[in-house]
């Protein structure tokens, strides 16, 4: 199983604000693009992928929307609008939830009022090896992947420096995809390809 966590610091937890920011400063479309490249392949989808989208622009609590590819049904199409509709449905379902609550949205999709820090801590405690993108990290092609790899990505707003120490305590390893700074959705394509080539 391969896991991706996208920390979307600019993405609104209010569904209509999120949609209004597609193509805007918050770049809400990154959520759909990352989902698309993590889950779909030509004429099919990957069953071995879990994606956690952590939306942090909020009036109350962050929202973590989890997509378990193997359990998803009626995805609705390989395009931005269909995938954003899934995110919107999850956000609408989360309205009024208290802190650290969870709700099933539909088959394969859940939403939690949970922070990025809490999500990655739980993943680490569950045996996932955390990997964070860093131009100075170990070249991904020289990496011996752990059995439960989890890749941490961000939107256009970099990871806060204060997060680095907590991630380091969780055993996070820094890896590099090359010298060029890429979008999260592009990173996902390269990571999936490297895992495929490694026979993962």
Curated annotation (Swiss-Prot):
Family affiliation: Belongs to the methyltransferase superfamily. TrmY family.
Keyword Zinc-finger applies: no
A Pfam family it matches: Methyltrn_RNA_2
Superkingdom, taxonomy of origin: Bacteria
Keywords: Cytoplasm, Methyltransferase, S-adenosyl-L-methionine, Transferase
Keyword Ubl conjugation assigned: no
Gene Ontology cellular-component annotations: cytoplasm
NCBIfam families the UniProt entry points to: PRK02135.1 (NF002560)
GO molecular function term, any single one: S-adenosylmethionine-dependent methyltransferase activity
Enzyme Commission (EC) number: 2.1.1.-
Main location: cytoplasm
Species of provenance: Alcanivorax borkumensis (strain ATCC 700651 / DSM 11573 / NCIMB 13689 / SK2)
Subcellular location, record wording: Cytoplasm
Taxon lineage: Bacteria, Pseudomonadati, Pseudomonadota, Gammaproteobacteria, Oceanospirillales
Binding annotation for S-adenosyl-L-methionine: 133, 187
Gene3D superfamilies given in the database record: 3.40.1280.10
Protein name: Putative pseudouridine methyltransferase
InterPro entries to which the protein is assigned, alphabetical: Alpha/beta_knot_MTases, TrmY, tRNA_m1G_MTases_N
GO biological process, one term: tRNA methylation
């Amino acid at each position: 199983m391969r896991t991706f966590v996208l920390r979307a610091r600019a993405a609104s937890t209010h569904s209509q604000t999120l949609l209004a920011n597609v193509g805007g400063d918050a770049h809400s479309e990154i959520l759909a693009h990352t989902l698309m490249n993590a889950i779909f392949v030509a004429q099919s989808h990957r069953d071995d992928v879990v994606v956690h989208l952590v939306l942090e622009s909020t009036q109350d609590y962050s929202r973590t929307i989890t997509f378990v590819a193997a359990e998803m049904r009626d995805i609705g199409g390989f395009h931005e609008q269909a995938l954003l509709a899934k995110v919107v449905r999850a956000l609408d379902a989360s309205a009024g939830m208290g802190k650290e609550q969870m709700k099933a949205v539909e088959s394969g999709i859940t939403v939690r009022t949970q922070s990025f820090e809490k999500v990655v801590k739980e993943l680490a405690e569950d045996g996932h090896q955390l990997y964070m993108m860093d131009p100075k990290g170990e070249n991904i092609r020289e990496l011996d992947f752990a059995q439960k790899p989890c890749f941490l990505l961000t939107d256009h707003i970099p990871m806060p420096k204060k997060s680095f120490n907590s991630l380091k305590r969780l055993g996070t390893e820094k890896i590099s995809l090359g010298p060029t700074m890429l979008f999260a959705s592009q990173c996902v394509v390269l990571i999936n390809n490297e895992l495929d080539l490694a026979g993962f």
